[in-house]
Amino acid sequence: MPEKVAKGIMCTGQVILDSPKEFVIDFLQGLTRPYQVVSRVVLTPQTVNELAEAMQQNLDMYTKNYGPPPPVPGPVPDRRPTIQEIYENFRLPEELLSGSYANSVLIGHSPTEFFMDFITGFYPTSAVAARIFLPVQQIPRFLNAINSSLKQHQMRYQRRNEPNGENPGTG
């Protein structure tokens, strides 16, 4: 594993984008200026579904061992910023424009952090494409965002692929 990937990246926020064939998760760092996208991971819808399941399992194990994650402190913003506003404030380095493709994910946790290894499983050797660390307080919100994005993706794109907008086998 390249040293750059092995060290991992701590992130303070996430943005999930989707298209018919893939999801893009941008991991943000907003502690120091310039605010920036610190990692971009490209996943298939199936891999995002597996990510949601694995994250839920890890959150359940975390809750069993340590109790529920503490809530993120601070005021709730009056409104969510638009995608355009986010990317006006967070610099996207040129080397991250294409992102890192992954077709599996490994998740683990400690009492204070979760980690995600996004893995590219190609012959002859699988490799970690990105390693992300998240504070435990962010996990419930991130999991909700993933699940919400999956539902929106299904409503937006899967109906288009079905003949006459009907579910297969119902007509």
What is the role of each PLM region?
Residues 1-171:
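Positively charged, low-complexity terminal tracts
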